[in-house]
Design a protein with these regions (language model features):
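Intrinsically disordered, low-complexity regulatory tails
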Residues: 1-36, 40
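Active-site loop/lid in soluble adenylation, ligation, and acyl-transfer enzymes
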Residues: 29-31, 35-39, 44-151
Length: 151
């Protein structure tokens, strides 16, 4: 299946939300942070929000814990995700709350690459593409717990 880059104007580009800018090492050294931060990953800055949101109630694991996990495994999983469009299975309120699938991106930061593809129903959709660790973390901060790349 051929993919083509879509025009920037097709996907609304968003600005980073407020918060202190921290490096990956500073982020990983935090103990139970609350609120929002901007995480500097390579050349990109990823807005990470609601870090204290509980994703797994029984274990009391938060969005911060999930982002930390993905930072630790990014070097191992990015080769398998690299340059593939993302089908986002989002749990924005944690695993006990309703989830939904998102394929068609309506907005994204400038550093998120996009691809316009035709889905199984014949509709053209604008997918976010896993291109860097920053893109992976952006999808995670949207509530994407599992990663589902388009094959």
């Amino acid at each position: 299946m051929a993919k083509e880059q879509i025009k920037v104007s097709e996907v609304k580009r968003t600005r980073q939300k407020g918060g202190a800018v921290v490096t990956v090492d500073e982020f990983l050294s935090l103990k139970r942070p609350k609120g929002d931060l901007i995480l500097k990953v390579g050349r990109e800055q990823v807005s990470v929000t609601s870090l204290d949101r509980i994703y797994w109630p029984e274990e009391k694991l938060t969005k911060f814990d999930l982002l930390s996990f993905y930072l630790h495994v990014a070097d191992y999983i990015m080769p398998f995700l690299q340059d593939r469009p993302a089908i986002l299975q989002r749990y924005p309120r944690g695993i006990k709350a309703p989830m939904f699938f998102q394929q068609d991106l309506d907005s994204a930061p400038e550093f998120i690459k996009t691809a316009r593809l035709t889905n199984q129903e014949g509709r053209q959709l604008d997918y976010g593409v896993y291109s860097t660790t920053a893109s992976l973390l952006h999808f995670v901060t949207l509530g994407t717990i599992e990663q589902h790349p388009w094959h």
